[in-house]
């Protein structure tokens, strides 16, 4: 699974398909392939292990022609990274690419083998190719064959099929894995992400759950899950395909804050269905490894460390598995004891953080059961050297102060926690569904949270002339306070500290005065009453409070305490949600102070030296 591109045109489509794959490279992949058929029904399939450039060179050398084609970048889930496991897969005249996980692939494989089909690869995708080929023997069209096949597939998928004997059309089915159709003039396209098509069209249609669409040069016909023909909205996109262009935004950081809803959708794509987490989508052999884990050790730096600190509460509260979190530069120099059946998790946006990479190499010598990384950059050292990788797919992040990398790490960690609890039988189906539904709701909720921008911009003026700021939180909101503190100091150069609110009496309370803003992250939960007592301690000593809480929390503002009332969201994802106003606050304080938001002094995006 990873990236899909398809095209039906009068002109040769090889260049369009390969360029589309280039635009999807940020999503992570280990192999790439393309299949193109010309008007005389001659089909050329080329697959390569490695970079899209290697595929591009092979396509150029072969001088591939043809107006109908599909292409794919693969991140291995079923079957090792290899050319034979790379997409597209074929069965007779049928060629298929696929994103996602077919959960009943073993059952279908046995059925197909009983019918005489021979499998060349280890992938679940080849099952789809054979199923479509089988159904086409009795179906009236490729469309009908794909519809019949889709009804037999279980899991999250987006799949595209092409028939060599009929090069005038391709058929796509969507269930849990996004598919967008692009409209041209006398040509039409499809992809798993509109970014792949922005160089050929700006008009897009997004398929809905259960849709199957037939695409020709001149028409796109969509059928819903019941088989009824339906119309889907066509929209004009103003998205920027170049990550190096700030577009309408003043800074990359602001742009990347606003990209978070889409980034979260990308992170979740193919990894959750309507009510469950797809464990195999996390990595090769993930289900087997997670079923044996007795302890989790997270190692990271900076923002990624704060994400790990947040996830520690989830591992213990949701999955019932002990979890330690260590700063990589400390972990690697400590004489630690490896617990039995321990899983090492490294977190890094770049995948090249020197201390984290060194910690991984050290840990592999110390008997960890397995090492995985949660990372945003495919092909990075952490990805290559870990046993398996969970790519966040946040897209290129240019601003030094991480935003979308943090929230996508958190969503990836929450999916991992849920999968771990699921594989060990520690969470119920009902709890799994509750978590997944909260994740599905998160992108829209964050989009709504961004509407607080003007209110927070006005609030930022209170901080711009201060020299210090204190952030407080309890439970998983303590590391969210840590992340808020880090953001403020990174880009505004204001000294900021974060404390677990219960630690106030143990020192920080001595700092409280009218010149010390105190920001409190205070959603409604079982620690709220304890947090309220800490708020009163600050209030009694003349501190100026800024409390971010939902209406149910029951705070009443006055001249010493400003309440920023947030919508109520699920407790499960509230830590991710409350990150957004903290990012906006830091951004606008820095803007008022006139600092270099995207490239703050003394800092680099990726710390590749010790």
UniProtKB/Swiss-Prot annotation:
It comes from the Bacteria. Residues 2-218 form the Glutamine amidotransferase type-2 domain. Its EC number is 2.6.1.16. InterPro entries: GATase_2_dom, GFAT, GFAT_N, GlmS/AgaS_SIS, GlmS/FrlB_SIS, Ntn_hydrolases_N, SIS_dom, SIS_dom_sf. One of its GO terms (cellular component) is cytosol. It catalyses: D-fructose 6-phosphate + L-glutamine = D-glucosamine 6-phosphate + L-glutamate. Residues 286-426, 459-600 form the SIS domain. It is an enzyme of class 2 (transferase). Keywords: Aminotransferase, Cytoplasm, Glutamine amidotransferase, Repeat, Transferase. One of its GO terms (biological process) is protein N-linked glycosylation. One of its GO terms (molecular function) is carbohydrate derivative binding. Its main location: cytoplasm. The active site is at residues 2, 605. It is found in: Cytoplasm. Catalyzes the first step in hexosamine metabolism, converting fructose-6P into glucosamine-6P using glutamine as a nitrogen source. Homodimer. This is Glutamine--fructose-6-phosphate aminotransferase [isomerizing]. It comes from Vibrio parahaemolyticus serotype O3:K6 (strain RIMD 2210633). The lineage of its organism: Bacteria, Pseudomonadati, Pseudomonadota, Gammaproteobacteria, Vibrionales.
């Amino acid at each position: 699974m990873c990236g899909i591109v398809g095209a039906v045109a009068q002109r040769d489509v090889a260049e369009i398909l390969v360029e589309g794959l280039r635009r999807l490279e940020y999503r992570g992949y280990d192999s790439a392939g393309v299949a193109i058929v010309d008007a005389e029904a001659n089909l050329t399939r080329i697959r390569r292990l490695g970079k899209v450039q290697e595929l591009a060179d092979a396509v150029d050398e072969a001088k591939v022609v043809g107006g109908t084609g599909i292409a794919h970048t693969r991140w291995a889930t079923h079957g090792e990274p290899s050319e034979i496991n790379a997409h597209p897969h074929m069965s007779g005249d049928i060629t298929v690419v696929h994103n996602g996980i077919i959960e009943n692939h073993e059952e279908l494989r046995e059925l197909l083998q009983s019918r005489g089909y021979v499998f060349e690869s280890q992938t679940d995708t080849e099952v789809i190719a054979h199923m479509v080929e089988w159904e086409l023997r009795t179906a009236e069209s490729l469309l009908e064959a794909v519809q019949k096949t889709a009804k037999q597939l279980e899991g999250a998928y987006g799949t595209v099929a092409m028939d060599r004997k009929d090069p005038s059309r391709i058929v796509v089915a969507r269930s849990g894995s996004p598919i967008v159709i692009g409209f041209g003039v006398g040509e039409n396209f499809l992809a798993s992400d509109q970014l792949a098509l922005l160089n050929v069209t700006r008009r897009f249609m997004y398929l809905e759950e259960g849709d199957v669409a037939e695409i020709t040069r001149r028409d796109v016909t969509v059928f819903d899950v019941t088989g009824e023909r339906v119309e889907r909205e066509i929209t004009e996109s103003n998205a920027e395909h170049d990550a190096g262009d700030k577009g309408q935004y003043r800074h990359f950081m602001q742009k990347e804050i606003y990209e978070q809803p889409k980034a979260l959708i990308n992170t979740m794509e193919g990894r959750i269905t309507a009510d469950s987490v797809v464990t195999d989508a996390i990595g090769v052999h993930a289900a087997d490894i997670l079923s044996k884990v007795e302890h989790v050790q997270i190692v990271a730096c900076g923002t990624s460390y704060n994400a790990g600190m947040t996830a520690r509460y989830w591992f213990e509260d949701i999955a019932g598995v002990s979890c330690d979190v260590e700063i990589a530069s400390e972990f690697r120099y400590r004489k630690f004891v490896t617990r039995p059946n321990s899983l090492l998790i490294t977190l890094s946006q770049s995948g090249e953080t020197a201390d984290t990479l060194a910690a991984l190499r050290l840990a592999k010598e110390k008997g960890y059961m397995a090492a995985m990384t949660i990372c945003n950059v495919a092909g990075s050292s952490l990805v290559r050297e870990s046993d398996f990788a969970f790519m966040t797919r946040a897209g290129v992040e240019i601003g030094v102060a991480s935003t979308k990398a943090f929230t996508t790490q958190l969503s990836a960690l929450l999916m991992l926690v849920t999968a771990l609890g699921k594989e060990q039988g520690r969470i119920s189906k009902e709890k799994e569904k509750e978590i997944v539904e909260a994740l599905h709701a998160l992108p829209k909720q964050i989009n709504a949270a961004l509407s607080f921008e003007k209110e927070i911009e006005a609030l930022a003026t209170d901080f711009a002339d201060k020299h210090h700021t204190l952030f407080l939180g309890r439970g998983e909101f303590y590391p969210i306070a840590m992340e808020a503190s880090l953001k403020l100091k990174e880009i505004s150069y204001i000294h900021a500290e974060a404390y677990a609110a219960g630690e106030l009496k143990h020192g920080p309370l001595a700092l409280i005065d009218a010149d010390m803003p105190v920001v409190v992250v205070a959603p409604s939960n079982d620690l709220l009453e304890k947090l309220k007592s800490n708020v009163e301690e600050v209030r009694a000593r003349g501190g100026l409070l800024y409390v971010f809480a939902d209406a149910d929390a029951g705070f009443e503002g006055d001249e010493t305490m400003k309440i920023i009332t947030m919508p109520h969201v699920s407790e499960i994802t509230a830590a991710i949600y409350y990150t957004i106003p903290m990012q906006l606050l830091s951004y606008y304080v820095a803007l008022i102070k006139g600092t270099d938001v995207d490239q703050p002094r003394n800092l680099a995006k990726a710390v590749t030296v010790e």
